[in-house]
Structure formats: C-alpha cells, structure tokens
Amino acid sequence: MSKNGAPKYVDGGRKIMDEDLRRDLEILRLILLRLSHAADDTSPLDVFNAYESVLRENGLNPARHRSYIRILYRLISSKKLSWNDEWRNLMRRIGFSQVSSDLNTPLFPLNNTDMENDPFIVNGDDYRSRSNQQKSSQFASEVAQTIKSQTAMFRRADQYRSQKDKILLANSLDFMLEKYRYYKKIDAVYLRKADAVYRAFIMLKYFPRWVQKLRNIQSRIYSAGEAYRLILIGQMVNRWRQKTRERLHQKLRFQKNAFLLDVLLKWSALTVNWNRKHEYMLKRRVFTNWMSKRRRNESLIQKANVFFQHSVLAHSFKTWKANLSIKNAATLYEKKVVFMSFNRWHANYESHVLDLQKAELFSQKAYYSIALHKWKLRIEELSDLMNKADDLYEVNLLQRMLVLWRRKATTYEKIDFWMDGHDVDIVKSAFFKWKNKFIKVDRNFELADTILQNTFLTKWRLAVRVKVVQEKRNKDRLIVTFRFWYYLMKAKSFQHKRDHRLLTIAWEAWKDNYQRRIKLQKEAQELQLTRIQKIAKQYLIKWRISLLDIKELSIRAEKLHTTNEIIGVWNQWVVSYNRKVGMQQNADLFFKRKTLRVVFEHWRYLRETNMLLRLENKVVDFREVQSEKLVLRCWNAWVARLLSVSQMLDTAELSTQKVVVRAYEAWSFRYNHQKEIMSQADQFYNERLMRSAMVFWRYQLRAIKFYFNISDWKRREFNRQTLRNAFDAWHLLMFRVTSLVMQADRFHEQKKNKLLGKYFRKWLQRMQLNQEESSLLEAEATIEGNRTSRYMHTFDTTLPMQNDEFTDESVNFENRWKQELKTPISRFSKFLRPIPPNTR
C-alpha cells in the first residue's frame, strides 16, 4: 500500500485491486449503505447493529473481525458530509473512484464472466506472476526455462523492458504524488508563516499609532477625571458635613441602644447563670443520690463476692485437707505394710503369706469401712454447711441475681477452670510422689536382687514379693483414682445442682416479678379505663349542659333581636326628625352669623386701612432716620464678607495647588511607570517577533535542508538502484562469460588431450612396426642401400595437424566460441545454471 492508502499493484499503467481488498471494501460499503438509510447515521447503536448484521450475512464473526468497527469509528469521527460523499472521497483517495462512484454500485460483479473481464480484479496466479516479474533474477531464470528460440527471447525481453518502464513510470508517478503532497504541506506551512509575518508587520506598522491614540485618550480621560475629582471633592465635603451630623445623631441613638442592650445582656446573662446554677444543683443532687445508691450496691456486691470467695476457698481447703489426710494415711499404711511384710518374710515365708492375705483382707475391709464412714460424715457436714450457705446466699443475693447472673457465670467459669487446674496439679503431685516412691522401691529391690541373686530361692521369693507389691500398688492406684474420680464427680454434680438451683431461684423470682408486673399493668389499664369512662361521662354532661345553655341563649338572642329591631326603627325615626329640626335651626343660625360676619368684615377693613395709613407714615419717618445707619452697617458687612471670601479663595488656591502638585506627582509616577512598562512591552514584543522570525527561519531552513536531503537521498537511491542493476547485469554477464571461457578451455583441453593420446598411440604403434621392419630390413639394407626408406615420415611431427578430421573440429569450435561472445548473453543461458549475485 502507498502512503495515500491505495495499493501499488500496477498492470499496464493502471492500478488493480486484490480480491481481499475488494471484499473488505464491499463489506464497508454495505455497512455505510445501511447507515445512510438509518434515522441517526452517527449513533453508536445504529452503527453497531449495521456492523453486526452485515458481518453475519457475510459469514464473519463480529467479535473477531474488529478492523471494520475501528474504520467505522474513524470515519464517524471525521464525518462532515453524507455517507455517499464520504464513500466517494474514500474511493477517490485510494485511487479506485472508477470502480465504485456511489454507495449503490457494488464492487463485485453479478456473474463470473464479468469478473473475468473486469480489469480491476486480479486472480491469485496472475498476481503471483506479476509479483514475481518484479524481480530481475527470477524473471531471467523463467525466461531461460520457458523461452528457447531467439525471437521469443527478444520479444520477452522487449515486454520485460516495457513492463519495467511501466513500473518505473508508476513508481515515478507515486514519487511525484508524494512530492506534490509534500510541496502542498510545505506551501500550507509557508502560508501559515506568511500569515504570521503579515500579522507581525501589521502590528509593527499600526501599533505605535494605536499606542499614541491610546495615550491621547488616556490623557483626556485623566484630565476629565481630575476635573471630575475636584467636583467630587466639593460634593464630598458637603456630604461629609451632613454625614458627621448624622453620625452624631446615630452615635447618640447607638449609645442609647447599646446601653439598653448592655442591660438586657447582663440581665439575660444573670438569668442564664441562675438557670445553669439551678440545673447544676439539680444534677448534682441527682448525681449524689445515684452515686450513693451505686456505692451501696457496689458494697453489697463486693461483700457478696468476698463471702462467695471465702466460701469457695473454705470448701476447696476442706476438700484438699481431706484428700491430703487420705493420701498421708495411704502412704503411712503402705510404709507400714512394706516394713511388716519385710520382717515377717525374714521370719517365715508361709506364715508371712497367710498373714499378708489376712492383713490384706482385713485392711481392705477396714479401709473401705473407715473410708465410707468418713466420707458419709464429711458429706453430711458438707451438705449441712452448703445448705446453710445456700440459704444465706439466697437471702442476700436474690434481689440482685438477674443483674449479676452474667458476671457470676464468667466468675464461675474461671473458678471451674482454676479448680480443674488445681485438680490436675494435685494429680500431678500425687503421680510424682508415687513415681518417686516407686523409684525408691525399685532401687531397694535392685539392692535386694544384688544381695539375693545368688540363690534361686531368694530370686523366687523376690519375684513373689515383687508380684505382691505390684498387685498391692495397682490396687492402691485403683483406689486412689476411684476416690479422686468419685470426689471430682461429686463436686461437679454438687456444682451443677447448685447452678441449677440458682437458675431455678432466679427464674422463679423473675417469673414472679413478671407476673406481678403483668398484674400491675392490667390493674393500671383497668384504672385508666375507669378514669377515661368517668372523664367521658363528665364531658358528656358538660356538653349537654352547654347545649341547653346555647338553646336558652339563642331564644334570648331572638327576643333581643326583635326588641333591638323595634328600638332601631324608633331611633332612626327620632334621629331623622331631630336632624330635620336641627337643620332648620342651623340654617337660621348660619344666616344670622353670615350677616354679622359681613358687617364685621366691613368694619375691620375700614379699621385696617386707617391703621395702615398711620403705620406707613411712621415707617417713612423711621426709614428716613435709619437709612444712613443701615447703609453703614451693610458696607461694613460687605467689606468683612469680601475679606473672608478673599481669605477663603487664597486657602482654596493653596489647596488646589497642593492637590494639583500631588496629582501631577501621581500622574508623573504613573506615566513613568507606564512608560517603563510600555518600553518593556515593546522590547519584549520586538524580542518575541525576532524570536518567532528566527524560529520560522530555522524551520524554513530545516525544511529546505530536509527537502534537499530527501531529494539527494532519492537521487542517491535512484543512482544506487541503477548502479546496482547495472552492476548486477555486469556481474551476471561476467559470470556467464567466465563460465563459458572455462567450459571452452575445459573442452579444448579435453579435445587436445584426446588428440595427443590418439596421436601418441598411433606413433607408438608405428614406431614398433618401424622397429620391427627396420630389424628385418637391416639385413636387406645392404641389398637395397640405394633405395630410400618409405618409412621416413615416421618422425614427422606435422602429420597430426594434417588430419582434417580433427583439426577442422577444433578450429570450428574456437571460431564458434568467439562468435558466441559477440552474440547476446541469453543465447548461453541454456547451457548454464548461474548463481544469482549477492546484490546486498
């Protein structure tokens, strides 16, 4: 495939299409055709449905063939026109616009004849033959194998040259297309850079004017702002005076409000503190009561725990003491039996055996009876004590049993664990004691064996003694283990009974409490029901009374309404009558008053005119007297006002001068700062412009160098390819020429050797014949001395060369070889199997 996406398969100057590529394009065309008929041709759901349906119709798996969906998403992402136009652009881009110019025209023809006649479909064999034709060495070997005649060879060579020229033409066209695309890209880059340079030129040309205009506008704005600022100063002074007066009034109001707020805040703080103290006192009282109850409960619980621990320790100590006394008695008894048996054995064996049997029977019975008696007594004592303890424990802890039952369970488990460990320790200590005793006895028996091993009787007696002692020891072990197991089971059963009894007591207490609560709840519900019934009866009675009151009130209201209506009508008539009488009286009074008012006003007018005349005369006289004084006073006031105004103008000029100086200083500072910033901006802009120009120049230089490098590389590649082809042809020619020369030399040498051998053999035969004939003819030499020998040509070396049969063949071969060197190379290809040269 070329860079533009089209395949580089060329046949006779035109591009051809492979069947696989045609099938892929046909599938893509079908998908785009379905998308063009869809409502939304760019939705992912429609794209996926069209993709799956078309692939399944063509026998493909959508999960495996994902290349189509990638191409579709690329086309959707770059879609700007309709799918028909996009398909037309795609076919034009890959160079097959003449195959399918529309989505409705299929790529595959309908019948096989059209497929055979289609110039854009290539079969596999033709494609392979055309791909093989691109290789010169394979093409030469195929020509050598298939073409034999000289005319066919020349015709095929001409075809190959034309095919090669066409391939070169197609490659040159592709190169020109690539070059055109490259120039197009470079032109686009040049256009962008020219646009950037033009913009920079416009900026350089019009930027100073814009800056000058901007500065003029800023100066005008600044002067207008200064004038506006002076006006604002006068307005602000007046507003400041008003604000100061308003602030004084606000301050007074604020002080009053602050005083009230301070009083209210203090009062609220006092109330809050009092409430907090009150709540603290209540909480403290509740907390002290709760703490006293808690301490009382804790003291009771602690006493109960101490009593329980003391009882458990006393019980364990008594059991341990009983077990220890039993063990001590057993050990003493064993020692006593051993000592007595040993002494009796020394006295008499038979009596000793009988005594031992009797003693064993007696001891067993006595031991069993004593142990049973002691055990019964101890059990009775323990049962009495435990009954008393249980009664005391039930009396003291019955109320707190449900609360502390879980805690006690954990303590009981720990105690059981400790008891089990203690029992194990006791068993271990008993086992170690028994082991030590057994070791001592074994040592004694070993000593006795060493003493009495000389005689059989002593050995037999010792064996009997050992057997008796072992039986006795085994019985003792069984007794001890049975006793330990019995006491252990008794303790466990006692503990189980005790726990069961505690649980039953707790359960009965909880049950009684629960039943009591249920009874109380039922009684409370009954009381509440009776109370609700009483309240309902009371409300019903009140409601009836209120209904009766409402009826009485409605009757009274109707009576009052009728009376009020009668009274209202009477009052309206009375009011209307009184109004008429009053209006007549008022009209009379108004007439009288109006006449009096007119008379009074006329009299007052006459009086006022007289008074005014008098006052005017007096005023004229007074003004004449006071005019001089007023003129002097006005002059003095005007002069004072003029002086004050001049002073105010002086102060205003000074203040304006100060303001102007400050404004000028601020303006000069801002102007200098702005000037520095503008100079820095101009410098930065010039540097940036120069940098961009340098970057553009570097990029252009690199592009030109790259273009020259590419052109040089293409030229070098073309020259290298031509030189390689020429060198390959020359190398092949030299190989064929040298092989032909070597074959000719070998052939000539073979012929030469054969001829020389043949000539040498003939010469030997003739030499032998001549010698025989010479020996025969020596006798006759004297007779025929005058006659020359007819065998003088025996040693003539020119004789073999005179044979036309051989000389003609060698001469013809040499002439033929020279003629073949002048002919084209392909004539000798049928005699050779050349090794292709290493073109690398």
Curated annotation (Swiss-Prot):
Annotated localization: Cytoplasm; Nucleus; Cytoplasm, Cytoskeleton, Spindle pole
**Keyword terms, alphabetized:** Cell cycle, Cell division, Cytoplasm, Cytoskeleton, Mitosis, Nucleus
Which superkingdom? Eukaryota
Q: What does this protein do?
A: Component of the spindle pole body (SPB) half-bridge involved in the initial steps of SPB duplication.
Q: What is the protein named?
A: Protein sfi1
Task: Please name the InterPro entries in this protein's record.
Answer: Sfi1_dom
User: What GO biological process terms are annotated to this protein in UniProt?
Assistant: cell division; mitotic spindle pole body duplication
The GO cellular component terms are: cytosol; half bridge of mitotic spindle pole body; meiotic spindle pole body; mitotic spindle pole body; nucleus; spindle pole
Q: Which organism is it from?
A: Schizosaccharomyces pombe (strain 972 / ATCC 24843)
Q: By which gene is this protein encoded? A: sfi1
Q: Which family does it belong to?
A: Belongs to the SFI1 family.
